[in-house]
From Swiss-Prot:
GO terms for molecular function: ribosome binding. Keywords: Chaperone, Cytoplasm, Ribosome biogenesis, rRNA processing. An accessory protein needed during the final step in the assembly of 30S ribosomal subunit, possibly for assembly of the head region. Essential for efficient processing of 16S rRNA. May be needed both before and after RbfA during the maturation of 16S rRNA. It has affinity for free ribosomal 30S subunits but not for 70S ribosomes. Residues 93-175 form the PRC barrel domain. The keyword rRNA processing applies. GO terms for biological process: ribosomal small subunit biogenesis; rRNA processing. This is Ribosome maturation factor RimM. Its main location: cytoplasm. One of its GO terms (cellular component) is ribosome. Belongs to the RimM family.
């Protein structure tokens, strides 16, 4: 796992015919994606970005050339954009970047039974979830909430999970409004 780069955005669908693309920024303020310096993708290509509207951007390659048109923009869909970890502030105590969780062992709270390793951190807009699995462990996806993960200590390399009997989602999922995920019960 490359811990020297932090995923900060993903290229979405083309916008128009002139090479503009939608960019989904993971920065707290989406426009701040341009403040962290050069962006690199999963292929090691270097990109710069200029915002042209709400979520719409012009991508330029390392030579400063913009995408040539809609076909070039279409080829960039789902391209992940990373920044150097050194460009970002160090997380405060009890804070971390999601990439720090990848590969960490997860144990059941109370029994210390291994549940697997964090394979993927999913964020589809309705809340973050962790996918656990690995050698000898069935895949398991849990909402990344304090109810399911009461202990996350990156410095100590420790994650403890409470397996819920039931997961309840409250709120309206249709308009990206506030959604609350709660876990009830739990294996102990």
């Amino acid at each position: 796992m490359d811990r020297e780069r932090i995923l900060m955005g993903v290229v979405g669908r083309p916008h128009g015919v002139r090479g503009l693309v939608r960019v989904h920024s993971y920065a707290a303020v989406p426009e701040d994606l341009t403040a962290y310096g050069a962006l690199t993708d999963e292929h090691g290509q270097v990109w710069s970005l200029r915002w042209r509207g709400d979520g719409i951007a012009e991508l330029r390659d390392a030579a400063g050339q913009p995408l040539s048109g809609r076909d070039a923009a279409q080829a960039m869909v789902n391209r992940r954009l990373y920044v150097a970890r050194t460009s970002l502030p160090e997380p405060d105590q009890d804070e971390f970047y999601f990439t720090d969780l990848i590969g960490m062992d997860v144990r059941a709270q109370g029994t210390d039974a291994p549940l697997g390793r964090v394979l993927v951190v999913h964020d589809y807009g309705a809340g973050v979830s962790l996918e656990l699995g690995g050698q000898g462990h069935a895949p398991l996806i849990l909402p990344f909430t304090r109810a399911c993960f009461p202990v996350v200590d990156v410095a100590a390399g420790r994650i403890e999970a409470v397996l819920p009997d039931e997961i309840e989602v409250q709120g309206d999922l249709s308009d990206k409004g506030e959604v609350e995920v709660s876990a009830t019960g739990g294996a102990s």
